A protein has these predicted regions:
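A short, surface-exposed loop/turn module that caps and links secondary-structure elements
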Residues: 28-56
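Enriched for short, Lys/Arg-rich terminal
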Residues: 3-4, 12, 23, 38, ...
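Solvent-exposed, charged helical/coil patches
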Residues: 3-31
Length: 100
């Protein structure tokens, strides 16, 4: 079983998400990740960071990194349209976490 940690940036993003159905689908995928260790539609985006793809509406993405084999750090979320910017931001957040 995985345990997740959320960054402030991820928490802000998910709270601001107005599409309730999208939010439910995203949270369900995270729950599946925690309980079943099932990543589903997921791909690497560089520096060990991976993109969890939720194929609904705007094509939501959750960027995360595994830590200590059983902890998933949820870095940030976004949409397909902001994918490159979000990947860059996820990498910056991870570097900041590792610095502290």
């Amino acid at each position: 079983m995985f345990r997740t940690e959320k960054t402030v940036e991820f928490d802000k993003w998910i709270r601001k998400l107005k599409d309730i159905r999208a939010k439910a689908k995203i949270l369900f995928r995270i729950q599946k990740l925690e309980t079943d260790e099932h990543f589903g539609d997921c791909k690497p985006v560089g520096d060990g960071i991976r993109e969890l793809r939720i194929n609904y509406a705007k094509g939501y993405r959750v960027y995360f990194k595994e830590k200590d084999d059983k902890i998933i750090v949820l870095l940030i979320g976004g949409e397909k349209s902001s994918q490159q910017k979000d990947i860059k931001k996820a990498k910056e957040i991870w570097k900041k976490i590792n610095k502290d």
